[in-house]
C-alpha cells in the first residue's frame, strides 16, 4: 500500500502534522511519501491520497481548493483531508460553524472520504481585539496541536487501508 500525504503550509504547522501522519502510516507498514503538493506529481502512482491545508480567513488557501478540484478529484484514488485551524477548538461557535462548513466544501470538491479538523499553532499571541472577535482565551498557548488526536486519525486511516 502506497500513500501520498500532501500539504500546503504557510508557517510549517501543516507540514509538521503531515509528517506525523506519514510517520504513523509508515509505522503500520504503509509506504508514505510526505511532500508539498505540486501539479507535476502523478497521483495515480498511489493507492491513497491524504491532503492537508491551513484555514486562513475561515477558508482554505485558494491554490489548495483549485488543486483538489483539478487534480486530486480526477486521480481516481481514495482521498482523505485534514484542515488545520487555531481557532476551531477554542473559538466562538460561529467561527467553528464557518470552519466546519469550509471543511465540508473542500471534502465535496475532492470527493474525499473524510475531512478532519486539527488544532494548530500561531507564531505568537493574538492581539486583544482578535482574541475578542474570535473568542479565544487570553492564556491559550500558541501551539495547541493535539498529537494524540492526529495519530488516532492517522491510525484510523491505516486501519482502512489495511482492511
Indicate where each model-derived feature is located:
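Short amphipathic alpha-helix with an adjacent loop that forms part of the alpha/beta core around
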Residues: 38-44
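Extreme N-terminal starter segment of soluble prokaryotic enzymes
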Residues: 1-4
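FMN-binding flavodoxin-like domain, especially the glycine-rich phosphate-binding loop
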Residues: 13-16, 24, 28-33, 45-163
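Short polar catalytic/cofactor-binding loops
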Residues: 8-12
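N-terminal Rossmann-fold cofactor-binding loop
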Residues: 7, 37
Amino acid at each position: 500500500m502506497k500513500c501520498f500525504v500532501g500539504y500546503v503550509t504557510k508557517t510549517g504547522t501543516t507540514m509538521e502534522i503531515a509528517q506525523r501522519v506519514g510517520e504513523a502510516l509508515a509505522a503500520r507498514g504503509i509506504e508514505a511519501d510526505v511532500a508539498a503538493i505540486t501539479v507535476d506529481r502523478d497521483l495515480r502512482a498511489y493507492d491513497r491520497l491524504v491532503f492537508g491545508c491551513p484555514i486562513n480567513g475561515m477558508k482554505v488557501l485558494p491554490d489548495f481548493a483549485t488543486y483538489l478540484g483539478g487534480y486530486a478529484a480526477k486521480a481516481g484514488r481514495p482521498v482523505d483531508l485534514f484542515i488545520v485551524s487555531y481557532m476551531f477548538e477554542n473559538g466562538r461557535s460561529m467561527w467553528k460553524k464557518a470552519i466546519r462548513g469550509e471543511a465540508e466544501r473542500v471534502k465535496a470538491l475532492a470527493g474525499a472520504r473524510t475531512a478532519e479538523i486539527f488544532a494548530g499553532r500561531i507564531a505568537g499571541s493574538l492581539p486583544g481585539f482578535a482574541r475578542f472577535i474570535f473568542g479565544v482565551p487570553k492564556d491559550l498557548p500558541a501551539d495547541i496541536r493535539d498529537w494524540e488526536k492526529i495519530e488516532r486519525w492517522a491510525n484510523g486511516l491505516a486501519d482502512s487501508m489495511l482492511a
